[in-house]
A protein has these predicted regions:
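Basic/aromatic recognition patch in beta-strand/loop cores that engages polyanionic ligands
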Residues: 39, 46-82
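Generic structural signal for secondary-structure transition and capping sites
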Residues: 20, 27, 42, 46-50, ...
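Arg/Lys-rich, positively charged N-terminal/basic patches that mediate binding to nucleic acids
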Residues: 1-36
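Short, hydrophobic secondary-structure boundary micro-motifs
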Residues: 31-32, 52-54, 97
Length: 103
């Protein structure tokens, strides 16, 4: 049985902002970015538990897309088989950017 993947509005905004930036650099590159992020979502539907926990008390994990230097940061609610995407941020951004979304 697959997991349900739900993106928070902030994560959707992250994706849109990054895609817009990539499209400003090269036509169509933002669409490739979105395709790559959606591929990550598809993989998370299969088994989000493959990724290490990144928080001592919460079930927070992340996965990198294949081509772009971004992290898809998510929380796993095992008893409900739900994956909540909280942030899609550049890998170089400080952890405080996504941590405040889990408070």
């Amino acid at each position: 049985m697959n997991w349900k993947v739900v993106a928070r509005p902030q994560a959707e905004d992250d994706i849109t902002e990054a895609a817009d930036w990539y499209n400003s650099q090269s036509a169509g590159l933002g669409n490739e970015f979105i395709d790559e992020i959606l591929a990550v979502f598809d993989r998370l539907e299969l088994n989000p538990l493959l990724h290490c926990r990144r928080h001592p008390t919460k079930n927070i994990r992340w996965r990198y897309p294949e081509r772009f230097p971004y992290r898809v940061i998510f929380e796993v609610i095992e008893e409900e088989r739900v994956v909540i995407i909280a942030a899609v941020i550049h890998a170089a951004r400080h952890d405080s950017v996504w941590r405040k979304r889990f408070r």
